[in-house]
Amino acid sequence: MSEKRVLRVAITGGAGRIAYSLIPLLLDGRVFGNETLIDLRLVDIPQADMRLQGVLMEIEDCNFSCMEKITTTTDTATGFQNVEVAILLGGTPRKQGMERKELIKLNAEGMAKQAKELEKHANQEVKILVVANPANTNCLAAMQAAPTLPKGNFTCLTRLDEERLRAIIFAEISKKLDKNAANINSSDIKGVTIWGNHSSTQLPTVHAATITIDGKVNKISDLCEASAFESIIEHVQRRGAALIGALGASSAMSAANAIMLHLRSWLADGQDEDAIFSMGIISDNNPYQESLNIPSGLVVSFPCRRVKGGLPGQVEIVDGMEVPEMLHPHLASTIAELKLEAKDLRGSEVVAESKL
């Protein structure tokens, strides 16, 4: 029997709601497999130290099969020491009356500090997933604050939006089909994509998506009414706000599930190299600069896939994906928002200090 490897993983916001849902997924092998043991570091602010201890007790009482070691700390130098994967959940939520520029500045400051600590203490090939909002621009701030870390090692989460899109598409298809007779489920839907910002301007697309029914590959666009696509876009764009309105808090369980899927697609062994998934990555030299006017210098959600024959963590933007002309204004809107956020980032004091 081969010896199990140990993977060092840090989570900021380690005492929070998303971390609480994510930890079991990491420690029972659902992300990196049963042959990988997790040396987990839960990092949070000093005010959350007591809650960290409570989370630690619960982890200990679960006896997870893939748990190697657990560290709880309020010191990033300790939490980030030699880590190979960093999941940045901790951020400042938007408060009533707060302008977007203020939110970007506050979070950019926090992300810059965390990124500098990762640059100083983490493994130099550390893979960084930014979840805290505004996720795309937070990821850009982190990336630029740690210039010695490869840009390709930074991503932000848009998989939650993709899963929301997959769910609503499945619901639409199920209205027309007997899903039990057809023996289908939502995981049979492939190629749905999120473009742009993780915000209400995002562009969900399904025009390259398919579903396999009874062994036959069908285009989603052939199974859904054309009139449904605009409402589907609006559903995904507004889903986060609707959830907050119903729950009184942002998503945690579904966010943790999306993080699991993101990390698995990006970093786990044995993944399908043809599978297309959405993630926010640096837009430098992207194949859509001319056709869709997506510039370099932003963190944008694209359709991505693993590099064929490459190592875990090596991904590429899928070229040739169709975005119908009628959706180009939607795409232009989300790119314009990202440009504005990047401009606000450049204008903040923390960016000037960090030479972002």
Regions inferred by a protein language model and the residue ranges of each:
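N-terminal Rossmann NAD(P)H-binding glycine-rich loop of SDR-like oxidoreductase domains
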Residues: 11-15, 23
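Residues forming the Rossmann-fold NAD(P)(H) cofactor-binding site
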Residues: 20
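Conserved N-terminal Rossmann-fold NAD(P) cofactor-binding segment
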Residues: 28-83
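Redox-cofactor binding/interface segments in oxidoreductases and associated redox assembly factors
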Residues: 87-88, 130
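Conserved NAD(P)H cofactor-binding loop of Rossmann-fold oxidoreductase domains
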Residues: 90-92
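Rossmann-like NAD(P)(H) cofactor-binding subdomain of soluble oxidoreductases
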Residues: 99-168
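C-terminal substrate-binding/catalytic lobe of Rossmann-fold NAD(P)-dependent dehydrogenases
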Residues: 146-152, 161-356
